């Protein structure tokens, strides 16, 4: 069975965190300016990603942003 996608937004830090499954300890790797993949340091599995300066990137924008990652999703 797949894992749920969980999101949290830190207004003070202007950071959107998206976790695949429950949030867990991870190493962050910047893949583009302000876009970070979170990787489990033991398994190497991607466990989420973070977007810094979220308002800067998305407020008032009608542009679609593309991250350099691929995902497989399913509806239960």
Regions found by a protein language model. Name each.
Residues 1-76:
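Small, basic N-terminal interaction modules of short regulatory proteins
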């Amino acid at each position: 069975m797949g894992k749920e996608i969980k999101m949290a937004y830190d207004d003070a830090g202007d950071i959107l965190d998206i976790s695949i499954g429950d949030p867990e300890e991870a190493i962050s790797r910047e893949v583009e300016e302000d876009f970070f993949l979170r990787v489990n340091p033991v398994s190497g599995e991607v466990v989420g990603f973070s977007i810094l300066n979220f308002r800067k990137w998305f407020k008032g924008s009608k542009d679609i942003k593309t991250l350099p990652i691929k995902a497989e999703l399913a509806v239960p």
